[in-house]
């Protein structure tokens, strides 16, 4: 049955307009993005099939071009459209951060870091550089690969901090495994960077580790 033949209250688009996007299932949201299904399969049915094939919404959103286009109903145009939507979301979060002090919008920090790092397939270490009022000056990826004490150089972090004339930093890196619990190396690295930055009177406010759930704050656990 075509979605046009469904009761109006059950159609994804009408449901979104009436109840808000949060009321929709992953399949319903994806159906609105796809707009149409394929022969013998409505957009919602196709969405359910795709979510099953990918193993969930996150895997679909993070798929590379070859993987994405290897599924029925998806192609290069849809991939480009999806990347544009995701990038607009990241830029919206970045603008939220730049408007206010990060102390006034801590959830915005978490949301932004999740959007920037969760999709990375390899470990990435980055910094949010802040001014004296704790407003964001810049977000910068500094190191990629295996993030440990041997691969992250305090000298380079200090150099970029001085270049931005930053007064404080938030450190962050991701765990592609999805487990955000910090390793001993993570905690030792944080201590080394905090010590190096203290020499130039710059504070490390937090170190967030990005995994599958909410970002883990080392400061909240007393590890900073």
From Swiss-Prot:
Gene Ontology terms for molecular function: metal ion binding; metallopeptidase activity
GO biological process, one term: proteolysis
Signal peptide: none
Family in the record: Belongs to the UPF0758 family.
The protein's name in its UniProt record: UPF0758 protein PA5319
Domain annotation MPN: ranges: 102-224
Short motif JAMM motif, span: 173-186
Domain of life: Bacteria
Binding positions (Zn(2+)): 173, 175, 186
Cross-referenced Pfam families: RadC, UPF0758_N
Origin species: Pseudomonas aeruginosa (strain ATCC 15692 / DSM 22644 / CIP 104116 / JCM 14847 / LMG 12228 / 1C / PRS 101 / PAO1)
Key words of the record: Hydrolase, Metal-binding, Metalloprotease, Protease, Zinc
PANTHER family reported for this sequence: DNA REPAIR PROTEIN RADC (PTHR30471), UPF0758 PROTEIN YEES-RELATED (PTHR30471:SF3)
PROSITE patterns in UniProt: MPN (PS50249), UPF0758 (PS01302)
């Amino acid at each position: 049955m075509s979605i046009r033949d469904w009761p109006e209250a059950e159609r994804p688009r009408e449901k979104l307009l009436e109840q808000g996007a949060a009321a929709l299932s992953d399949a319903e949201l994806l159906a609105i993005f796809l707009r149409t299904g394929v022969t013998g399969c409505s957009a919602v049915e196709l969405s359910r099939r795709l979510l099953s094939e990918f193993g969930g919404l996150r895997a679909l959103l993070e798929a590379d071009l070859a993987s994405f286009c290897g599924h029925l109903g998806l192609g290069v145009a849809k991939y480009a459209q999806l990347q544009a939507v995701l990038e607009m979301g990241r830029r919206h979060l970045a603008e939220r951060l730049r408007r206010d002090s990060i102390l006034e919008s801590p959830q915005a920090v978490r949301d932004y870091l999740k959007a920037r790092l969760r999709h990375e397939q390899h470990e990435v270490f980055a910094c949010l550089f802040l001014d004296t009022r704790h407003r964001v000056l810049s977000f910068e990826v500094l190191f990629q690969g295996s993030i440990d004490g041997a691969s992250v150089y305090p000298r380079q972090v200090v150099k970029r901090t001085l270049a931005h004339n930053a007064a404080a930093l938030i450190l962050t890196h991701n765990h592609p495994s999805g487990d955000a619990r910090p390793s001993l190396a993570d905690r030792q690295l944080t201590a080394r960077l905090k010590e190096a930055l203290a020499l130039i009177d710059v504070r490390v406010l937090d170190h967030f580790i990005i995994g599958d759930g909410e970002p883990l704050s080392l400061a909240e656990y007393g590890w900073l």
